[in-house]
Amino acid sequence: MSHSASLYAEAQQLIPGGVNSPVRAFNGVGGTPLFIASADGARLTDADGNSYIDYVGSWGPMVLGHNHPAIRQAVLDAVQRGLSFGAPTEIEVKMARLLTELVPSIESVRMVNSGTEATMSTIRLARGYTGRDRVIKFEGCYHGHADGLLVKAGSGALTLGQPSSPGVPADYAKYTLTCSYNDLQSVREAFTLYPREIACVIVEPVAGNMNCVPPLPEFLPGLRALCDEFGALLIIDEVMTGFRVELGGAQAYYDVKPDLTCLGKIIGGGMPVGAFGGRREVMAALAPTGPVYQAGTLSGNPVAIAAGYACLREVARPGVHQQLTQQTERLAQGLLAAAEAAGVPLVVNRVGGMFGLFFTESPTVTCFQDVQACDVDRFKRFFHLMLAAGVYLAPSAFEAGFMSLAHGDAEIRHTVEAAAQSFAQL
């Protein structure tokens, strides 16, 4: 038995499912999950000493690569001053200043501890600011595990929300309306049904939790127009896309201005951090200046914020996003060529430093229904073949892949060669 397998067996006796987040259990691909001992640059090393080129990147935060010296030093320096104070610190002000400079739609920002806290808080703020209760989200888009957002569509796009998890009261979930991603007509119909009841629309600008599905050109501008028409707030969830697809986020890449933005992952540099911000007048509704309550004992933790601040300073350097995009494009082109040579139907979606692989005969993948129609069994086989070749992809057909600045020509070449051999065995 491998050391990873031994650790997993022990963990299953102590931790629900043996993991602290479900996707880590490899349920989407089968087999025993890797237990990681260390990471550096573009590579992970597991508990058995095996090395892998990593395209998970801790599910997005590691845009610079693992164990980046600037982030490591920032954490070490911060630890010397203390771990947590429960009081304001200078680094919070610096971080807020940097975020407002990099993302122009954010005029005021509050730090929290996770992406889930960020989305949960923006929904509460939108409801409190507008005095409305209903929320529109999109099928296949994930916004954390807050009760009101763990909802999917019923038999039709405008069916009242049905909980996706036990423990979410139906009476609460009914305030969440689920529309089809990239389908503006379904959103207009929702607004027509509830013209003065919808507080906000929350959307992943690139849907990264149904693999990687970019918006159609008219989708995000159309959401902005519908929100303006019906007096709702537009919330762009950039927990995954923020500072990855473009320096100013997907909202800069696609030129759309939200009322509120959710951030996470990269802004922590690998530490647990989230944030939300937006129009000053909306953010002023938060306590202590307004009536909408939001708080957190560890919010703005000085060690975590120091890591995130160092990460953003590096990400903001000239040429970073051009490099991410170029390397992701090289990987995508190599994978497509290898798949074509093996006669394997494959679609590769990509935006900036994000990408997604879809085993499908369809020429495009633009919505959740397209994703569901893909060959998941073929992906499972491909995942394990790649893992055996030293390449670690997301262990789910419904999760995006992530490029980092540490992925160089050698890593991409090895990945494409491994993929060619794997495609030949599918």
From Swiss-Prot:
Locations listed in the record: Cytoplasm
CC cofactor: pyridoxal 5'-phosphate
Molecular-function GO term, any one: transaminase activity
SUPFAM superfamilies for this protein: PLP-dependent transferases
Gene Ontology terms: cellular component: cytoplasm
Record pathway: Porphyrin-containing compound metabolism; protoporphyrin-IX biosynthesis; 5-aminolevulinate from L-glutamyl-tRNA(Glu): step 2/2
Reactions the enzyme catalyzes: (S)-4-amino-5-oxopentanoate = 5-aminolevulinate
Record-listed E.C. numbers: 5.4.3.8
Keywords tagged on the record: Cytoplasm, Isomerase, Porphyrin biosynthesis, Pyridoxal phosphate
Pfam families on file: Aminotran_3 (PF00202)
Modification N6-(pyridoxal phosphate)lysine occurs at: K265
Main location: cytoplasm
InterPro entries per record: 4pyrrol_synth_GluAld_NH2Trfase (IPR004639), Aminotrans_3 (IPR005814), Aminotrans_3_PPA_site (IPR049704), PyrdxlP-dep_Trfase (IPR015424), PyrdxlP-dep_Trfase_major (IPR015421), PyrdxlP-dep_Trfase_small (IPR015422)
GO annotation terms (biological process): protoporphyrinogen IX biosynthetic process
Keyword Isomerase attributed: yes
NCBIfam families for this protein: hemL, PRK00062.1
Self-association and partners: Homodimer.
Family the UniProt entry places it in: Belongs to the class-III pyridoxal-phosphate-dependent aminotransferase family. HemL subfamily.
Name of the protein in its database record: Glutamate-1-semialdehyde 2,1-aminomutase
Origin species: Sodalis glossinidius (strain morsitans)
Name of the coding gene: hemL
